[in-house]
Amino acid sequence: MGIRDFVVSAPQLEEVCPEGLRPEETVCHISRQKSGAVSAREDDIVITADTMVFLDGKRLGKPRDEADALRMLTALQGRHHTVCTGVTVRQGQRMLTRAQSTQVWFRSASTEELKAYIRSGEPMDKAGAYGVQGLGALLVERIDGDFFNVMGLPVLLLSRMLAEFGVTLL
């Protein structure tokens, strides 16, 4: 993306959210929590994000095991769901948080196809049990919105947020 001289840090925190938040509020809340858990020098720019999959307003996290992955993928069959990402950019005391939502439609797939996908191992560390950037793309019929959001980081939104901090990528 044109960013040089950076460090990747995975903050260790328990993602806790108040009940009753809308999907966009939920991912923004967790993104801000992650930002607060990362220490930085005053002039450093910290970027954090959190992506979640929502089906019928309910969060689909990462599958606990293969049976859970099959349950999630079966529930997504022939339907659409929402992928939300909260992005936070922080420099010193200044912090900006925004959300991006994308609608994703899954095609109908056979149980055998879903089990083969699960055996690949790809779904096991992904919210909603699929990765659109890999074999999971074969389950997706249509995307309405930012493709990169479904991957976990809406790059256009991030570039616009960085521009507000004086960082341009092009």
Regions found by a protein language model. Give the residues of each.
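N-terminal G-site helix/loop of the GST-like fold
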Residues: 1-9, 164, 168
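Short, acidic/turn-prone active-site loops that include or flank metal/cofactor-
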Residues: 10-16
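Anionic-ligand binding patches
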Residues: 21-170
